[in-house]
Design a protein with these regions (language model features):
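Hydrophobic alpha-helical transmembrane segments of multi-pass integral membrane proteins
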Residues: 1-422
Length: 422
């Protein structure tokens, strides 16, 4: 199949980046539990490959898919992928000029998307002024996160603030931009799975008010190194996440509790968002007295952060891809409306295969990271329960990713001119 630089190419390439980054991440996780941790370079490749090449490229594809006329965008596509590649090569070799150039290219890649972001604001199911506040924080976080990431290799940040700068950089991009964009989009997209309506616009307004407010307070806590301010921000975000989760679940119930692969993924993702924010609050509470109540090391940090990265972000985006890919493929490959309907139905059947296996392997695999971290409190790192749980979790996550990747390949090779076997 020939892929142009339309939204479909962004979505497919974004998942390829996510898959590669996840394979690196699984190797890092198993190495950590085996007592043979890999270096900082591999961790950086994993994080930036997944976040920028993967998640943010998928978000760019989803924004472009919302255009009335889905034209080819080779400049944005090349900037995102070459920028990500340049950033990773620069990090691997410690080449600061290349990293700086890549960061500037990545910033430039999102400039042409400003109109799509504005359209997202205007079409939000939650009206003004909350939609302007919500998406305004998301846009500022995107710009701030990319600029903060560029400031370190450009040496524009004082050396004693580099640690805080990296913390702000990652939180601006993940929680300030990605989490807010997904939550905002789901208020419109999730009801569309069932051709229904959002259960409560009032709860939507509360979510749009509290999530970004909590994030701003949390960010202030990081900058001030004040744990109480961080906890206050986390509590505000948790209340916003609870409003969001309740609204999503009730929307599903109002539609008659249908079982659809896309909605199932997004429902479980809302649960992980609540769990992740709760764990974040507990992380701060754990060190309120200076000495932590329970030990908290790099393995615990990895388990906690991936409740958000895999449990919320990845599952939500896979849900969106499950719903959108058959439509985009049918539109790109067929010119006849008569042929498009049956072809899209065949593609929907393909993407729905093994959906239960995919959902539960990814969900239980994500929770297994937390189980491994908890086991370390009771057993040494080289004990068999820790190793067995780590291996089982890695295999579950790998299985879920391979299932989706296999279905994606089947979608891409499905011929609209041949009768489908599904």
């Amino acid at each position: 199949m020939k892929l142009t630089h339309r939204p479909l190419a962004f979505l497919v390439m974004g998942f390829v980046w996510v898959l590669l980054a996840c394979l690196i991440g699984l190797a890092l996780f198993l190495g950590m539990t085996a007592g043979r941790p890999y270096g900082q370079v591999f961790r950086s490749l994993h994080v930036h490959g997944a976040l920028i090449g993967g998640v943010m490229q998928i978000i760019a594809g989803l924004l472009l898919a919302g255009r009335e006329h889905r034209t080819s965008q080779p400049t944005i596509f090349m900037a995102l992928n070459l920028g990500t590649l340049g950033l990773l090569i620069g990090q691997a070799h410690g080449h600061f000029p290349l990293m700086s150039l890549a960061a500037i290219v990545l910033i430039g890649a999102f400039v042409p998307l400003r109109g799509d972001l504005v359209r997202q604001i205007r079409h939000s199911i939650v009206g003004a002024p909350m939609n302007y506040w919500f998406y305004g924080i998301a846009l500022v976080s995107l710009a701030g996160g990319l600029l903060a990431g560029a400031a370190v290799p450009l040496r524009l940040m004082p050396y004693n603030l580099v640690g805080q700068g990296r913390l702000v950089h990652i939180h601006l991009l993940t929680q300030g931009f990605v989490v807010l964009m997904i939550v905002g989009a789901m208020h419109t997209q999730f009801p569309a799975f069932f051709n229904g309506r959002l259960h409560s616009p009032i709860l939507g307004q509360l979510t749009f008010a509290l999530l970004p407010l909590g994030f701003v307070v949390l960010l202030a806590g990081f900058l001030l190194t004040n744990l109480w301010v961080q906890i206050a921000g986390g509590v505000l975000m948790l209340i916003g996440a609870l409003c969001y989760s309740y609204n999503i679940v009730r929307t599903w119930q109002d539609a008659g509790r249908p079982r659809k692969p896309a909605s199932d993924l997004c429902l479980i993702a809302t649960l992980f968002l609540v769990i992740a924010i709760t764990c974040g609050i507990l992380v701060s509470v754990n060190v309120l007295e200076g000495q932590p109540f329970v030990p908290f090391g790099s393995l615990h940090l990895a388990a906690y952060t991936h409740l958000t990265f895999i449990g919320f972000m990845l599952l939500s985006l896979l849900g969106a891809l499950t719903d959108l890919l058959p439509n985009l493929l049918a539109e790109d490959r067929t010119t006849s409306n008569k042929k498009r309907g049956p072809y899209e139905a065949a593609l929907t059947g393909i993407i729905g295969r093994w959906s239960t296996v995919q959902l539960w392997t990814l969900s239980i695999g994500t929770m297994s990271l937390a189980v491994v971290a908890a086991l370390v409190w009771q057993y040494p790192l080289n004990a068999w329960p820790v190793k067995a749980a780590a291996l089982a979790g890695a295999l579950l996550l790998l299985t879920g990713l391979v299932v989706f990747a296999t279905k994606l390949v089947q979608l891409l090779i499905e011929d609209p001119d041949q009768p489908s076997a599904s």
